[in-house]
Design a protein with these regions (language model features):
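ATP/NTP phosphate-donor binding region
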Residues: 2-99
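A glycine/threonine-rich phosphate-anchoring loop and its flanking beta-alpha core
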Residues: 9, 18, 114-206
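C-terminal charged capping/lid subdomain of soluble metabolic enzymes
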Residues: 14, 184, 286-368
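Glycine-rich beta-strand-to-loop/alpha-helix junction loops that act as flexible
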Residues: 73, 103-105, 246-247
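Solvent-exposed alpha-helices and their adjacent loops that cap or buttress functional pockets
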Residues: 93-95, 118-119, 147-148, 155-158, ...
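Short glycine/serine/threonine-rich phosphate/pyrophosphate-binding segments
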Residues: 107-114, 135, 253
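Active-site segments that bind and position negatively charged phosphate/pyrophosphate groups
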Residues: 204-317
């Protein structure tokens, strides 16, 4: 593929997503091309990003720069760190024409974007996602948020960036586990929206995971395109955007039960969540057997050892169920699950009693 570019158009802002290699080496030109003209920049970056990339970014931005480093951890995505960022912006007299640049994965992006969104009611924000997961998920759509002891992303805002720069070269520095995590979101997008794309993934899974450029670039592009179409129709998640949460009710409850530990990261939780949502759909005669088996086989090819028994036991069932009840999609006393009719056709108005969901989760431990 040539340089891939997608424009996101919403009521609250339009912005481009650039997908290619060597983008960071052309950062100065890109910022100028897309009218990112600021006198000061706060660059918030993940400490795991290779130092050479931070040096390149510093060299390309010939303005006043403040660097702020965080460890990428769900536990660090909190109000305390938001306050820390806001205090730095205030102490250095940032105004609304200045810019925050996030360089890292989804956690750093969420934290940075939320701080930018509430500082003087909105500061310019540029997202440079460095993980596959962030490039295909959190960098698109304007969701920002932080965690609380009550659950994940319960405090946040919708705030669109001015620009997203997805440089594929960053992915070369990631461990295989992180690539698999990002692939889980790509798989989710194909399952809810495009069977042809799902078939492409099934055919080329190893080439994608090994970051072969035409395949990984196409996968990122197609995945972003799916999310773009959904976000443009429903920016604030009133209706169709809820489909992007396929597997996430389960995923978030699995993460929360483990206290957002590194034992299970977000991408792995999403894959487990997809697996659970498909099994729930199949057991309730919503999803047909052929597509159910295609998805389950695909997940096994990704990581055959990824199952609930690896992380939980039956004694964790009550805690898992408890965290599903704080999901933002729920109404009254019922759990709203995003389920699947067939590959490419999800459904988002499926309400079940907590007791019914508890029985299902308990039975999963017998089947994994």
């Amino acid at each position: 593929m040539k340089n891939s570019k997608i424009f996101i158009n919403t009521k609250n802002g339009s912005y481009p997503i650039l997908i290619d290699s060597e983008l960071i080496n052309n950062l100065e030109k890109i910022l100028k091309l897309y009218s990112i003209k600021s006198s000061k920049y706060l660059i918030i970056f993940d400490k795991n990003v290779p130092k050479k990339y931070i040096r390149i970014i510093k060299k390309k931005i010939k303005k006043k720069i403040i660097l702020l480093k965080f460890l990428s951890s769900e536990k660090n995505k909190n109000q305390k760190n938001v306050d820390y960022i806001l205090n730095i912006l205030l102490k250095n007299n940032f105004n609304r024409n200045d810019c925050v640049i996030s360089v890292g994965g989804g956690i750093i992006g969420d934290l940075s974007a939320f701080a930018a969104s509430i500082f003087k009611r909105g500061l310019k924000f540029v997202n440079i996602p460095t993980t596959l997961l962030a490039q295909v998920d959190s960098s698109i759509g304007g969701k920002t948020g932080i965690n609380t002891k009550f659950g994940k992303n319960l405090i946040g805002s919708f705030y669109q960036p001015s620009l997203v720069i997805s440089d594929i070269n960053f992915l070369k520095s990631l461990p295989p586990r992180e690539i698999i995590c990002g692939y889980g979101e790509i798989l989710k997008h194909s399952i809810i929206a495009n069977k042809k794309f799902f078939s492409f993934l099934s055919k080329n899974i190893m080439k994608i995971i090994k970051l072969k450029k035409p395949y990984i670039q196409k996968s990122i592009y197609e995945s972003c395109l799916i999310k773009k179409k959904i976000v443009e129709k429903d920016e604030k998640e009133k209706n169709i955007r809820k489909l992007l949460n396929f597997g996430h009710t389960f995923a978030h409850s699995y993460e929360a039960t483990l206290g957002y530990s590194k034992k299970l990261n977000h991408g792995e939780a999403v894959i487990l969540g997809i697996k659970s949502a498909c099994e729930f759909s199949f057991k309730n005669k919503i999803l047909n057997k052929v597509d159910y088996k295609l998805i389950q086989d695909h997940i096994i090819r990704i990581n055959k050892s990824l199952n609930l028994n690896k992380f939980f036991s039956k004694k964790d069932v009550n805690r898992i169920v408890k965290f599903t009840t704080v999901d933002k999609k729920n109404i009254s006393e019922k759990i709203n699950l995003i389920l699947l009719k067939k590959i490419g056709k999800p459904t988002y108005k499926n309400f079940y009693k907590v007791s019914y969901l508890k029985k299902f989760i308990k039975n999963q431990f017998n089947n994994n």
